Amino acid sequence: MGLEWSSPGERQPLLFPGGPRSPRVFGRRWLVLLLFSVLAFLQGLVWNSWGPIQISARTAYKFSGLDIALLVLWGPIGFLPCFLFMWLMDNRGLRITVLLTALLMVLGAGLRCVPVEDLAIRRILIHGGQLLNGFAGPTVMNAAPFLSTTWFAPDERATATAIASMLNYLGGACAFLVGPLVVPAPNSTSGLLLYSGSTDAIKDRIEAVMYAEFGIIFVVFAAILAYFPARPPVPPSVAAASRRLSYRTSIFRLLSNLRFLLIVLAYAIPLGFYSGWIGVLDLILTPVHVTQVDAGWVGFWSIVGGCVVGIAVGRFADSIRGVLKPILLLLFSGATLSATWFTLTFLSNVTHLPLTTATLYTSCILIGVFLNGTVPIFFELFVETVYPIPEGIACGVVTFLSNIFMGVLLVFLTMYQMELSWLNWCLTGSCFLSLFFIACFRESYDRLYLDVFVSV
């Protein structure tokens, strides 16, 4: 009876006839992880280039508030061809997909550097460059679990996923640091060196940053072109050697899996809102008289803290397997409390909570620590829940939905720019909702079962 409801692909045995060769790991896996992580770092750095220096960018290039919002919005818009990249990864492998991604980033970074005197044309080129960089987002966000399964042993997978996925966030964090320190604010000396805040001086510094980013991205592209294997000679685990469902079957299975959809919403809503929120943190903190540099430091440490916690939690998950849901419950409890604290701080006249630099720093950094720390754990849980659906397809659906929520938030931002406290309430409410979804979720570890018991 069950055969009537399954596709031919689903009726194939997971393991190839005769069994897979004995699993083995190769030292080159760390080089592959390094190249991919650096690429992900640079994509995040370029995506978040403009938010932290939005005041200087308005002066140098006559950007409007709508322009600044659009420069951030190109990130989620770049996820529209997400399903194409998922298909490419599933059918052509990691090398072709990563090469195409790196090429898009080179073209995007180069487009921003075209020396045109007309500011209107220059703004169009910058927008185009940001869009091309956005098209690289699906790969750098989705491929981490695929890479870790392809190259790493079961007791290293969560750690590799954490490193590969967190470096993209770290790149976005470094944009909060690099931009405000290198690019001076108008009529100030807040840059890396004492420097006149004139329009020409600001423009020169912004262009220096863009040229440097282009050069580094080109070097990474050349390194990937020279050496980035699609897979190791021998799979590192039983799961890596097993058959996977086809692209079409995987999509249907994902959309009909209620447990998967529940945990997807638990990830997509708060992480999507947080990505949009942190991208315009400078605008949110402006009404409470936080400078561009201070806002940059807040954003930087909030994401860096999340990256450190994410990698540490990933290592812990590798050491003690089967505890992904409790980890998520703990992290989201902290995120919910921190977001509530940050939001109520802006209502100090009502709540009487102190509105100081220390409270803003602490609450904002804790939000980033707890939310960003959940990303690699979510990715591992997605793959475990829907195995044997390919990792790239499962995570592609997830990040696509996350960017839809991020895009919706930024679209509303383009219409309601005067008063931004509603962004804080959206973030807090999404954390509460996600905590409820995680509590209702029933976890399973199908891929882990295959590796532990079948290999034995």
Curated annotation (Swiss-Prot):
Catalysis: reaction(s): pyridoxine(out) + n H(+)(out) = pyridoxine(in) + n H(+)(in)
Glycosylation positions in this chain: N187, N349
Motif Di-leucine motif: chain residues: 14-15
Cytoplasmic side stretches: 1-29, 89-95, 145-162, 229-259, 314-326, 384-392, 442-456
A Pfam family recorded for this sequence: MFS_1
GO cellular component, one term: membrane
GO BP field: pyridoxine transport
SUPFAM superfamilies linked to this entry: MFS general substrate transporter
Membrane topology per record: Multi-pass membrane protein
Keyword NADP tagged: no
Main subcellular localisation: membrane
Keywords carried by this UniProt record: Glycoprotein, Lysosome, Membrane, Transmembrane, Transmembrane helix, Transport
PANTHER family named among the record's database cross-references: MAJOR FACILITATOR SUPERFAMILY PROTEIN-RELATED, SOLUTE CARRIER FAMILY 49 MEMBER 4
Chain's role: Mediates H(+)-dependent pyridoxine transport.
Name this polypeptide is given: Solute carrier family 49 member 4 homolog
Protein species of origin: Xenopus laevis
